[in-house]
């Protein structure tokens, strides 16, 4: 015998499957779903226990329906016979509505049941239709005050006291109340398997589940929307039983129940009211009604159609005009590469450097995948998040009708700072009352070995020259001195720039930071290449120049010659009618140095307005930066405006941090740095690049975010530069470059400016098209283990400029075979790298003739073939060398080899001039007497 399933037991017990599942769970039997099987012992226990708990909901109680409680003796009046109801007038057909305090369950007395059967009581088959027409007026005003017994299988049962505020709202006050007879003849639960009602409670309209939109076609559901909703005893939405008339059709003699303005189900008062009438019919309007019914319309209090189409017009049909216009524009958009993209009308779009297709798609409101397809259609392959260069964006913009502009790094950085409420332009516009005088910033420029550092030593009374490697300056030095001008102490900030040609960037940086430039020219050398370069830097920065003609005490000095040479570059002395001040000095002897300082201050007072606001946040530039072993990152900064304090959060390029300490050029601690003051700052997280502007951020968090966003921007820009459009010609060029031998170099230096200068000088070395230099890494600080590992993988050479590794790193480099070269003077490093490049060139060979031998006799051997008896005319014949045959001065055979060389019967390695020998040319036997055997070899020549 098959096991019973849960839904079968529910049908047998007359309850729903959910109730059975809950009961099984209470019994300790956990089943999964209604389709699960149940064991026979559990079935018996369920059937034995269920009538106690579920019988009240599934089986009616005849005793309760026939025996009223003692609290309602007047409740038997509404149980009048239908005949009396039919013969009465509308005003007197039924007693008045019960008062609030009466029970809603008006069961008849014991004798009322027989009386109703004798007076044409409708049969059980007609009970549902009668109840649908007469039960509605009895409904109370509150939704929860249902008539008793309607939830219990249609039988009348006592309910708690429910006051009926508002009386009978249906408009048929004379309709009889439902009696006990209607509940007496209801079918037993579970007898009819095809009935919708299997002993379960009759659901009220609020409990009836909405049908699925696809379950059946749309019907007239006014009984759910209008007055048919919420009335007890009404079975709106259920099909009538067989043998039963239409649910809204009145019985003979009962037309008085259907008043004007009320539907067959006793709808809301007033037939012309929205939603009134047709409470009892399902598919057609059988009852009279004054007002037209709105089939499918939502009545007052009805739901918005959560499960069907009863809720009125669908929200999907209510598309706004903007959405329709957007769809129309998309349909009008041209198809490019198989996708539709709305083209622009030449509008300008600004993108950052290193932007991707996703950034562009966000600007023009399209799908990034569509832009990838269009770019692929144009012959370019890129992902949505890949950084692209400006040329690629321009090609794409021309195709889709947009003018794409890549913003510069300065504009992008300005927009970044504005996000943190930092506006550099507005801070430059200071009020006159806030501006105070500041010292001038003077840069000393000129050719190498013309005495720039010696001049500063004389001014500062120091000896920096003695501490410099090679006697040349290789970094920018910043100093501040106090001079006496007409009894007044004045401060001057000096920047000492290198004069070597490798430090062009440093000189340009010094010219941008300075107020006045001192051009030092040696009286014996005159104008030199770096002198001209310094003049160009100063003039491009619009900086006034004071010329110091140095070394006037050296024999052969000619200051007038220097003045004449400088007039060619626009520097005309005042004595010649110009505006440039010339001072003849001797830095070594200290001659006229005070006059030079006086000229600098006069120029500053006459031509410049040197004022700044010391009360604002500090702004300035990074002059130099290095990595100190004990202090970490140390940056030499020049404060241009504001005051820098200890504890300020600063950002310098991609580096950030908090000022932990400040030192002057002499190593003394400072608490604050005023405008035009050079100071060494400690506390940065990394070494900034020389020339980066620094500023004070509101807090540490803002400083870190600014630095990180700058790092991301630089990284994206670098990735965009690496990706370039490769045409066929460029591909051939790249393929040719792949055959070039590259010298990989790792550069480590003591300061960022020195590393920058060394890298720039090395990249300018040009030896040949066959070799090149590639700097795979550069950094500031000592040589570390990571540098050695990187050089080992890429077979690179490490150059340490004024830095050295520790013992462990040196041992690792020796084990890995990594070469480390140490330099303290930049031009020595350049010379060695240039020599290394020349050594990497492929060797070139030239042919050198070594001897001539004349054949005078031919010996024939069955084992060795023909053997030539020769006389060595010149040079030296060696065994294994290349040879050729000359017959009558014409080369007849080439690429021969002397395989055997004998003198008499002995094998020899070589035979010199004037001796006879026997020569065997291997398998070659076509020789004649009188031929000349010429030997030669390929010798390597030096590449220059």
From Swiss-Prot:
Entry keywords, A to Z: Cytoplasm, GTP-binding, Initiation factor, Nucleotide-binding, Protein biosynthesis
Region described as G3: 496-499
Alphabetized PROSITE patterns for the sequence: G_TR_2
UniProt-annotated location(s): Cytoplasm
Start and end residues of each stretch annotated as G5: 586-588
HAMAP family named among the record's database cross-references: IF_2_B (MF_00100_B)
Protein name according to UniProt: Translation initiation factor IF-2
Naturally occurring in which organism (per UniProt): Bifidobacterium animalis subsp. lactis (strain AD011)
